Amino acid sequence: MDNDDYIWLDYLTVEQPNQEKTDISVKHYYGIDIKTDKYLQNAIDIWELINKYGKKYFCNYGGETFQINIGDRFYVAHFPSQCLNNGCKYPVLIFLHGLTGYSWHSALDKTGLIELANQNNFIVLFGQGNGEITRPVRDKYGGVSFGDIYWQIENPELDMDYIRNVMNLQGTIEYCRQDDLNLLELRKMFSDKIYLIGYSNGAMYSFNMCFYDLHFSGICSMMGGYGGLAGYSNSKISEIVDRPINISLDIPIIILSGSLDEYLPASKKAFDILLGKNFSNVKFLSIPDRKHTYSRDFEKYIWEFFFTSTKN
């Protein structure tokens, strides 16, 4: 294989899971004390809470928030209270976390999508990538890692059955209130508007979905873009974007990056590819002085762009 097929960004490397460090070794290695690292401690608290209750954890943040299991994988669903039991249909947003991410952490801490869903009356589903979830640590690049967890960027078809299941609310509920929530009835609440947001590794997967007919109504690739410039095989990603396009070319798409993000070239290339393929409703945003970080402050902008572009 040509060397040009792989252009690596070092911080993609994932530490080996199950190498748990003591408080002393963590402080020595990272120069921090995990007891004073609020963000890491929040991640640990969430992991311990979910680990304690297993598949039965349930919480209420302005609605019903719970885990749905599909074989050896799962996803987290949130239905706002005002959307339940009124017979109406509501749009759905699916979120894909970044490399080493965790859906429960995305739902309860990293993103503000549950609050946004409560405010704007939509359903939000948090996908879970491939790999074993472990107790979170700071990796050597400073990020919080839940293990070697990822989306199938070079072979997106391997995750597509899972994504379809999420879109159709497939799976089982295994907590003590399962008799109160019927997935078949909840699925009837879905409108025909299903949107996709991916961050980092999830953003690269989301960009790939621009070339598959899964009937998404809008797609956002945040801090990711074209995987062939972000550590994955350029030839394999080229094959994906050169597929025959069977989706509407006016689907609203946002490519969002930061001016200091190492993935900015990958995001720019993603935008150029979409324009070259005659997609007609594409926005490119480069946030000034923003590094590679989840941009919670742009969630509302993304949602409003999706909603206003597809409200008819």
Curated annotation (Swiss-Prot):
EC number(s) per entry: 3.-.-.-
Hydrolase found in the keyword field: yes
Keyword Isomerase: no
Enzyme superclass (EC): hydrolase
Keyword list, A-Z: Hydrolase
Protein name, per record: Uncharacterized hydrolase R843
Family: Belongs to the AB hydrolase superfamily. AB hydrolase 2 family.
Database matches in InterPro entries: AB_hydrolase_fold, PLipase/COase/thioEstase
GO MF, one example: hydrolase activity
Signal peptide: none
Active site feature: S200 (charge relay system), D261 (charge relay system), H292 (charge relay system)
